[in-house]
């Protein structure tokens, strides 16, 4: 909205919309973490309880379980794939819209300024998804 329709930004991005975006993000994170936590709570752990990692993550915990963890691994893969693909889709779609607006700008100077506004964020996104 800020690049494609800058004059409509304050009209579209009301406090209500911002709160809905924040609550939606938190609810998605809560659903993701609760699913994995409840799945891990149902697993029996026996034997060594030392995790040879810097921080406690789901795959090392699954290795300590002494029962079948296929369901947990499937949930982990599914949630990770859905979150990554949804994020990639939203970012790609927004940059396609931004690119179409940039290409419609008549002046070279205006096109350069608008592109340079997005270039640093686009570089960071490319590095993040590329690594």
UniProtKB/Swiss-Prot annotation:
Q: Where are the transmembrane segments?
A: 17-41, 83-103, 117-131
PROSITE patterns in the record, alphabetically?
A: G_PROTEIN_RECEP_F1_2
Question: On the Cytoplasmic side, which residues?
Answer: 1-16, 104-116
In the record, the note on similarity to other proteins reads: Belongs to the G-protein coupled receptor 1 family.
Stretches in topological domain Extracellular: 42-82
Tell me, in a sentence or two, what this protein's role is: Odorant receptor.
Q: What are the annotated GO cellular component locations?
A: plasma membrane
Keywords per UniProt: Cell membrane, G-protein coupled receptor, Glycoprotein, Membrane, Olfaction, Receptor, Sensory transduction, Transducer, Transmembrane, Transmembrane helix
InterPro entries listed in its UniProt record: GPCR_Rhodpsn_7TM, Olfact_rcpt
The name on file for this protein is Olfactory receptor-like protein COR9
Compartments (UniProt record)? Cell membrane
Which Gene3D superfamilies does the record match to this protein? Rhodopsin 7-helix transmembrane proteins (1.20.1070.10)
What GO terms are given for molecular function? Answer: G protein-coupled receptor activity; odorant binding; olfactory receptor activity
Source organism of this protein record: Gallus gallus
Q: How does it sit in the membrane?
A: Multi-pass membrane protein
Query: Which gene name does the record give?
Result: COR9
Give glycosylation sites per the record.
72
